[in-house]
Amino acid sequence: LVARTMTQAERWLERHHDEQFFLYVDTWDPHEPWDAPDYYTAAYREGYAGEQIYPAYGNYKQAGLHRDDVDLGHATYCGEVTMVDFWIGRLLAKLDALGLRENTLVFFTSDHGFYFGEHDYFGKAEWVHDAWAIVAEGSRMPSWLPESWLLTVGWSPLYGEITRIPLMVRGLGLEPGRRTALTTVPDLTPTILELAGIEAPASVQGDSFFGVLTGERDEQRSFVVSSWPLYFAEGEITLAVDSRPRHISSYMPLTVSTRDRSLILGGPDDEPEFYDLVGVPGEQDNIWESQTREGLKLARQALSFLEEQGTPQEHVRPRRMSLERFAAGNARGNSDRTERPQQWVDKEAG
């Protein structure tokens, strides 16, 4: 798909290169299925001629897969990424050939990452499957994957492997280098508009990180919020992916990230997960019970941010209920506050 998409993008540029333009190109790849030609994947799994491995979309061990299955999937994914890299290079070369390098801004980013065994996940979400599903002959892709409405969407935490995405910017006057400021996808639009000399409409959310790109400042945000749609709640039905109805079996969590901490908030029955990204990298050691006060502070900031963006209370309330419940046994143990935890959260979370 990426080959056809980039070829069409090149042709579009040939027709419109002498005009002012905004071109958005969605490669789709490296989305699964990872079926790049063998010459792309050979560097990562030389000589493999077996079946294609499809993500388990959940705990790969519980799905009956082994570590080598995940590694095979990762190899074909890497082949897909290499293919995408080649075709993006073609598009950039076309810009150069048309004389557009010096007056064209290029932004490269993605929507999310993928789990390849981290936290025992293989996929990007927890899909709770029909226990009686039959595996399709000659493939590890279950036959119900494209067919069964019995599929349900379960608890799917957004760890760093999902939330950290690439962002590369090329443009006239921007010096090569790396930036470590925290940004989020809504910041892209106002940044592009500012770089193009266009005033952002009042309806545009997000904040421009133009100053970060030019080196005028080092910071953008103190924290960022990543989430599934907050209306993905227990008992709801989603038609996402292919318009087939699928049940949602739990509140979909959101993740609050700073430079050195991450916090995962779910529904009323879900205990928060709080991680020290510096002391124990990889989000493996939940410190919520020992650092509840710090976790609550970050949670209050995140919930206030959601409210400022106009998030309906019906979507904020379940997260606050989780804090009220799971702070009860911990907040006084690691803080000098004396109020009841529920009062504390209600008062300071807005």
Whereabouts are the PLM-identified features?
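Catalytic domains that recognize anionic headgroups
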Residues: L1-G350
